[in-house]
Design a protein with these regions (language model features):
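Bacterial N-terminal signal peptides that target proteins for export
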Residues: 1-12
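Extended ligand-binding regions for polar small-molecule ligands
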Residues: 23, 61-70, 131, 135-136, ...
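Extracytoplasmic small-molecule ligand-binding "clamshell" domains
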Residues: 28-100, 170, 245
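Ligand-binding cleft/hinge of the Venus flytrap
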Residues: 49-53, 64-73, 150-171, 200-205, ...
Length: 256
């Protein structure tokens, strides 16, 4: 069963939503006068986030800037509300969705550039939890980010090893899902392994990650069906080249 938090829980967590939606100006380095590829994403460290110096940083930021450079474009980033992502590309507010976005199960929903890397979907629990396997999640409460693969996995239960949880709590931002786990509102939180790893840097002793992962995701860049397919193909070729020449591996090591 899927539920949304209301009342006091929403008030506790709403600050995250307000901050993410504030639309503060973000500085970008000066670049050549090139055609722009407008990239939509939410803040999802370490893939894309706004640094203290008000610049975009992260794995996907570095990959996007280099891939765009190789095809003669300039990457321009726009923070969006992730559960409204399809509206943004359908209305042309952004050209593509790029932010640790899983292609799996969505192959026919968009034009894709990639995949350019893989990521595991994992489950995070508190250190003192009695949950050690996916099966232990039966009857438990799980927090996820709305419209992500973990949400889909727990709601649809398309694989036989996915447990029947009591409730799936869907949040606009992953930080809210982590907060729900931290405050004891839920028993577990599911997200990308890199995202969980970033969260654990400051709280390693308080949490642990289950050995069993939910799935392995192939990450890509999503465009609407009506977008210029030549640009999509060129970007996909650039990403493949970056995988082959070690550029993507080098970028990933930077954020370990």
């Amino acid at each position: 069963m899927r539920r949304k938090f209301i009342g006091v829980i929403c008030r506790v967590l709403c600050a995250t939503v307000i901050l993410c939606g504030c639309g503060a100006e973000v500085k970008m380095p000066e670049q050549e006068n090139l055609p722009v590829l407008t990239i939509g994403s939410d803040e999802y460290e370490p893939f894309i986030y706004i640094s203290d110096s008000k610049t975009y940083e992260g794995i996907d930021v570095d990959i996007a800037e280099e891939a765009c450079r190789r095809i003669g474009y300039r990457a321009e980033f726009k923070i969006i509300r992730w559960d409204d992502k399809d509206t943004y590309i359908e209305n042309g507010n952004v050209d593509c969705l790029w932010g640790s976005f899983s292609m799996d199960g969505r192959e026919d929903a968009y034009q894709w550039a990639g995949p350019y890397m893989t990521s595991k979907q994992c489950v995070l629990v508190r250190t003192d939890s009695d949950i050690y396997t996916l099966n232990d999640l039966n009857g438990k409460k799980v927090a996820v980010q709305a419209t992500t693969k973990p949400e889909e996995i727990f709601l649809k239960r398309s694989a036989s090893d996915i447990p029947m949880v009591e409730s799936v709590y869907s949040f606009v931002e992953t930080e809210e899902a982590f907060a729900a786990l931290r405050k004891g509102y839920v028993d577990a939180c599911a997200s990308h392994d890199y995202r969980i790893g970033t969260y654990l840097k400051n709280a390693l002793s308080k949490y642990r990650v289950l050995d069993q992962e939910l799935m392995t995701s192939h990450l890509g860049v999503a465009f609407s069906k009506g977008f210029d397919s030549n640009v999509v193909q060129k970007l996909s070729a650039a990403l493949n080249e970056m995988k082959s020449d070690g550029t993507i591996d080098e970028i990933m090591r930077k954020y370990e």
